[in-house]
Amino acid sequence: MIEKLIFDLSREGRKGYSLSGNDIPELSIETVLPAKFLRTEPADLPEVPESEVVRHFIRLSNMNYHVDKNMYPLGSCTMKYNPKVNDAACDLAGFSELHPLQPEKTVQGALQMMYELSGMLAEIAGMSAVTLQPAAGAHGELTGILLIKKYHEARGSKRSKLLVVDSAHGTNPASAAIAGYEIISVSSNADGRTDLGDLKAKLDGEVAALMLTNPNTIGLFEKDILTIAQMVHENGSLLYMDGANMNALLGITRPGDMGFDVVHYNLHKSFSAPHGGGGPGSGPVGVCEKLIPYLPVPVIERIETPEGSSFRLNTDHPESIGRMMNFYGNFSVLIRAYTYIRMLGATGLRRVSENAIINANYLLSRLDSRYDLPYPKPVLHEFCLSGDRQKKAHGVKTLDIAKRLLDYGYHAPTIYFPLIVSEALMIEPTETETRETLDLFAEALLCIADEAENSPDLLRSAPVNTPVKRLDEAQASRQLNICCQG
């Protein structure tokens, strides 16, 4: 049953509450605001009693899907369960009641937390320094690319090209384009990894950097990464790592040890902050030693004196690329990531990645007999199936499979990405799911594979059990109607 809009529940004269009389004289708004700021007709606001308001939003919340409700298999999104202790740390008055314009001496605890988090992230990825400013992954990409650009400019080199592997997230070429680079695509080989021959052919004196995700979006580790790093560096270029898939690497290996010069982290993914509703995110950037002078300001520094240590925000970095956002990053996500890392420690972080890898390979082993596997096993933290078999044999597309999963009570996985996989189904179970949960999800996909053979029309009309049935997504994206007509 479709829930009505709050405006449709409105009835004239109904009120949620009313205020008792008081002895404060009533003031006419016309005497306070100029006429140009006043409405010419009453606002079209809903008139609904409190009980109906509460029930309306409770009903909507029950229809919502979130990681606290069930497994959230979005590939390349790392929708892990977020420990509630992280939220408790955020709610501490010493954090929640701060204002970013307070004097430094009154926010020493917050500065210490950010300073220590930067150090921990640098150690985890094997980088020399980290900035916490970027607001999310794509913002981190842009920050990293601007650092690369500044590095080349400081050396008198006006390089104009940036290489991006064809399996990359779409934000990679977008971020590079915003920074002013020409995007050159590097092909993947038959194994789903970077084609070294194509990379060699495209490396020239105009290439500023190669952007690479490791493991890549198919869930495969770039086993030739040391060779790739050598090729890039011998060309005078830098190597950038999209850290979207770092949940596979924690405590096992480090991007800095692979030869990456820049890496961004997605704290909301690998380091556990809620992001299913679209944010907030956090995309810190780690750099090698030679890029430190260009980091965004202000830089958090620790000062040692005979009286003890303190922390400050230093803007005196003349080679810096400047600020990447107001203030110091998405602070609440930084607190959650700090708490998560402190709770787990080095051993716990390694177990996170080990269990993520185990879960992905177990789930793949349950599914690869009924869905096509475009590239060979094993994978790391996620995998990519193809619905080509169902499409060719029964006319059932990956979109139909994803829609049918909604009827089984699951959020759909990422579909039609990466672009190098036809009819792609991209699944990332994360480390926080039990074997029983994985089995239930696998059974749903196996049942859907049976339905594709025996009841293809059911899949083509799915979902059939959800409050809202299949939408015309093309029309919805082209003819927006987001206003309520009173």
UniProtKB/Swiss-Prot annotation:
Modified residues (N6-(pyridoxal phosphate)lysine): 269
An annotated Gene Ontology molecular function: glycine binding
Protein name listed in UniProt: Probable glycine dehydrogenase (decarboxylating) subunit 2
Record carries keyword Oxidoreductase: yes
Catalytic activity, as annotated: N(6)-[(R)-lipoyl]-L-lysyl-[glycine-cleavage complex H protein] + glycine + H(+) = N(6)-[(R)-S(8)-aminomethyldihydrolipoyl]-L-lysyl-[glycine-cleavage complex H protein] + CO2
Cofactors required: pyridoxal 5'-phosphate
Gene Ontology biological-process entries: glycine decarboxylation via glycine cleavage system
UniProt key word Oxidoreductase: yes
Subunit and interaction comment: The glycine cleavage system is composed of four proteins: P, T, L and H. In this organism, the P 'protein' is a heterodimer of two subunits.
NCBIfam families reported in the protein's UniProt record: PRK04366.1 (NF003346)
Coiled-coil region list: none
Class of enzymatic activity (EC top level): oxidoreductase
A single cellular component GO annotation: glycine cleavage complex
EC annotation from Swiss-Prot or TrEMBL: 1.4.4.2
HAMAP family listed in its UniProt record: GcvPB
Family under the similarity heading: Belongs to the GcvP family. C-terminal subunit subfamily.
Function: The glycine cleavage system catalyzes the degradation of glycine. The P protein binds the alpha-amino group of glycine through its pyridoxal phosphate cofactor; CO(2) is released and the remaining methylamine moiety is then transferred to the lipoamide cofactor of the H protein.
Gene3D superfamilies found in the cross-reference section: 6.20.440.10, Aspartate Aminotransferase, domain 1, Type I PLP-dependent aspartate aminotransferase-like (Major domain)
A Pfam family it matches: GcvP2_C
Keyword vocabulary terms for this entry: Oxidoreductase, Pyridoxal phosphate
Organism: Chlorobium limicola (strain DSM 245 / NBRC 103803 / 6330)
